[in-house]
Amino acid sequence: MIHFNRLFSGRFRVRLLLMILLVSICSNGNIFAGGQDRAGTAAAPELRIPVGGQYLALNGSAVAYASGLEAIYWNPAGVYLNNSNASAIFSFREYIADMNMSYVAVSGNFGDFGTLAVSFRNLNVGDINVTTIQQPDGTGEIISPTYFVLGFTYSRVLSDRISIGANFNFINESWGGVSANGFSVDAGVQYRDLFTPGLSLGVVVKNLGGAMKYDGSALFIQADDPSSGRGNTFYQVAAASFELPSEFSLGLSYTKALNEENLLSFSGAFVNNNFAYDDYKFGLEYAYNNILFLRGGYLFSPQSSDDRPNIFQNYTLGLGLNLREFSDIDVSLDYAFVPVEFFNNNHTFSIRVNF
């Protein structure tokens, strides 16, 4: 007789999970292909815009120990780590060129079953005046593009050290009479107290899914094909399809308690990007009495000529404040500063509430 409890022991489940991740990576053969030579050609670039102020201040290096609702973006394996019955977060990021990114998510803890979460990301690019060759100053028409990602997350504990998580995302882009829909999956693992207490390992693959393709009435044009004999008629322009910006991240972190009031957390991550330079990220967080948090991060890309992969500068800064000690509500405020070249600097604000 098969003993299912033994069959699905902790070690077996870890091996099975790692096997699934490897199969997922291998089945998406292009995940490690290309790089910077394909920058700007991916579908759904909004998938790569970080949200939340807590871990953005660490430059995204906290793959191994990200927890709570901000972990949805960085590593869904950490979503369960919030020791509360329910949680909510709202985040707002001032992006480049008058664009901004809003993020809201809620989660519920269902005991041994795990944690379920729903998230919504919206990239607001503002209104765009329509221009043509004949009317370069504008036709008077205004289009308002919409870009959003609706996500469903599942996270649970496999043992006292191991957690897993996955995001299932619906992607929608719509503007000027055309639209495109897509689906993507993120999957991650976190392993705590690896070899020694405080040392954690995190692995995550993100944005796995099929290509996206635009469709809609704006792709129809009027033309006259003399060979058809049909006169002036409508023809549909064949839109190209574009791959999602897949990436793979491997991270380590180490947390050290200096005393009862002071805590230091070091984090680092390697990120292999399908449509950009590979990144090395490092972060440092200082926590005082679990009330005040000071954060900083640094990123460099050896493949880039100046160690910087894009218009964003190498470093990030931020701070956090936990108001639980001063009120009856478990509320945390976070801020992240991202310096930018050519555009205004990015400011990200977020508020987290636990119930």
PLM feature spans:
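A compositional/structural signature marking long, glycine- and acidic/polar-rich segments
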Residues: 11-15, 290
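N-terminal secretory signal peptides that target proteins for export/translocation
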Residues: 1-12
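Subset of outer-membrane beta-barrel
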Residues: 30-355
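Charged, low-complexity surface segments at secondary-structure and domain boundaries
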Residues: 3, 19-21, 43-44
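Bacterial N-terminal signal peptides
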Residues: 17-28
